[in-house]
A protein has these predicted regions:
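A generic structural motif
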Residues: 93-95, 111, 121-127, 178-185
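A short mid-domain helix/strand-loop element embedded in enzyme catalytic domains
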Residues: 155-180
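Compact, glycine/acidic-enriched structural inserts
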Residues: 113-149
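Hydrophobic/aromatic-lined pockets within catalytic cores
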Residues: 17, 21-25, 95, 106, ...
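Flexible, glycine/charged-enriched surface loops at secondary-structure junctions
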Residues: 27-30, 150-154
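Single conserved hydrophobic/aromatic residue that forms the stacking wall/gate
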Residues: 186-203
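Internal mixed beta-strand/loop scaffold within catalytic domains of large alpha/beta enzymes
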Residues: 42-117
Length: 203
């Protein structure tokens, strides 16, 4: 499963870069980096005419958790060794009519293994129809696998992005999830589902 997830993240990264370049004519800058223990990743950054700043990054690393982390990470108390692979996408557009988009997904293994991640939008201007469409797409995909997923993971995202000092949310939310042993991202045909939901948001 680890290699399957790694390959899926790499293919998704290539597709996201390709589809972003359809509307953004500036090219991405790529930079590889190495992890101090083992592994590394590929940073793909852009500053363009439509995307003010953006990054589509992948990584695959392994190592050992320190004693503090061993107590907080599932399965690490039995064995501190870990491997992780994932993708992180952040797109901040020039136009206030286009929302900022954040998306990340990871697969982590200790003595246990699981998927985690999330996706959210932060618009400058409120477009109710588009906000409803975004959440309906997420709900539709989640409901294919478990009707409890969407309300549970939407609530988690809403709570995380609630600004207590302002008494208001940041953006329109999305979903957060963690500790899924059989993630909806990796069960056919869900990768196609997630791409259909995600790409219009990033454009």
């Amino acid at each position: 499963m680890f290699n399957e997830a790694k390959n899926w993240f790499e293919n998704l990264r290539d597709e996201l870069v390709k589809q972003t370049q359809v509307f953004e004519k500036k090219s991405f800058n790529e930079k590889r980096w190495n992890h101090h223990d083992d592994g590394g990743g590929l940073m793909t950054k852009i500053k363009g005419s439509i995307i003010e700043k953006g990054g589509i990054n992948i990584s695959t690393v392994s190592g050992k958790f320190n004693e503090k982390m061993q107590k907080n990470v599932l399965g690490a108390s039995e064995d501190p060794k870990f491997s992780a692979t994932g993708i992180s996408v952040v797109l901040h557009p020039m136009s206030p009519h286009i929302p900022s988009m954040h998306f990340n997904t990871r697969y982590l293994t200790t003595t246990k293994s699981w998927f985690g991640g999330g996706m959210d939008l932060t618009p400058c201007l409120d477009f109710e129809d588009e906000s409803q469409f975004f959440h309906k797409e997420l709900e539709h995909i989640c409901n294919k696998y478990d009707s409890n997923y969407y309300p549970k993971y939407k609530k988690w995202c809403d709570e995380y992005f609630y600004l207590k000092h302002r008494k208001e949310p940041r953006g329109i939310g999305g979903i957060f999830f963690d500790h899924l042993n059989s993630c909806l991202l990796y069960t056919s045909p869900s990768p196609r589902d997630m791409r259909r939901s995600r790409m219009p948001s990033s454009a």
